[in-house]
Amino acid sequence: KSHVPSLRRDIGMVFQDYHLLNDRNVFHNVALPLHVIGCDASEISYRVEDALDMVGFEGKRTHYPHELSGGEKQRVTLARAVVKEPNLILADEPTGNLDPVAAFELVQLLETINNNGTTILMASHNYNLIKGRGRRIIELKDGLLRGS
């Protein structure tokens, strides 16, 4: 149990339902994990800007979640996951609430992050979105795991 906080530093989370704080703007939502681990203000500013740039989120850093589209909210959620520079990102149905174009773009972003050295573990019901991408797919069917 004492290792949980250090493990959390190495894991980023992306959820289907975003889990953004409605009373905080985009910048502060992404900065939250850095505050939790005790980063100073200058490092937070730099890393948040870098994470938002990485996910292609420009111009709405002072907007609040209710002002964003579903695709924009998911990009903010992904920026919050990568801002700590984790070794692993757990993505639980990250495309579930997105239109097909936004879902495709999000999977491309996850692939880019993976190509930069971060392991991505993504749960998805949308097999057509992930098949043929040259990635390992493990299917859970009837309680059994099947690899491809």
Predicted regions and their residues:
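Helix N-cap at the start of a conserved alpha-helix in ABC-type nucleotide-binding domains
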Residues: 100-102
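ABC ATPase NBD coupling module
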Residues: 1-12, 41, 113-115
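Hydrophobic anchor residue at the start of the ABC signature
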Residues: 78
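Short coil-to-helix segment of the ABC ATPase nucleotide-binding domain corresponding to the Q-loop/switch region
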Residues: 24-31
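Catalytic Walker B motif of ABC-type/P-loop ATPase nucleotide-binding domains
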Residues: 89-92
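Conserved catalytic motifs of ABC-family nucleotide-binding domains
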Residues: 85
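Conserved ABC ATPase signature
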Residues: 64-68, 72
